[in-house]
Amino acid sequence: MGALTKAEMAERLYEELGLNKREAKELVELFFEEIRQALELNEQVKLSGFGNFDLRDKRQRPGRNPKTGEEIPITARRVVTFRPGQKLKARVEAYAGTKS
């Protein structure tokens, strides 16, 4: 199974919408930049029919160095989480067990 890249997304925009390649690449970059900026501003990103990107604060917790077994603290941090929407879940589940 391969991975969808930003370059492939831009190529699809070029082919499907007739944008030139530079415009298609800029559109993809702008889309992701908008998501990044919203998250930087502590905003939730809701993409209808796809899912939500949220920020979650994780508290400091104890961890362990796997090599030495030494206990070390894992610092508090903020993480981005993604929760798929119902439509996305349904489409993924419809293809469960099929090979591409």
UniProtKB/Swiss-Prot annotation:
UniProt entry tagged with the keyword Nucleus: no
MF-aspect GO terms: DNA binding; structural constituent of chromatin
InterPro entries: Hist_DNA-bd, Histone-like_DNA-bd_CS, IHF-like_DNA-bd_dom_sf, IHF_alpha
Record's keyword terms, sorted: DNA recombination, DNA-binding, Transcription, Transcription regulation, Translation regulation
SMART domains for the chain: BHL
PANTHER family in alphabetical order: DNA-BINDING PROTEIN HU, INTEGRATION HOST FACTOR SUBUNIT ALPHA
Subunit record text: Heterodimer of an alpha and a beta chain.
Protein family: Belongs to the bacterial histone-like protein family.
Function, in words: This protein is one of the two subunits of integration host factor, a specific DNA-binding protein that functions in genetic recombination as well as in transcriptional and translational control.
Name of this chain's protein: Integration host factor subunit alpha
The organism of origin for this protein: Ectopseudomonas mendocina (strain ymp) (Pseudomonas mendocina)
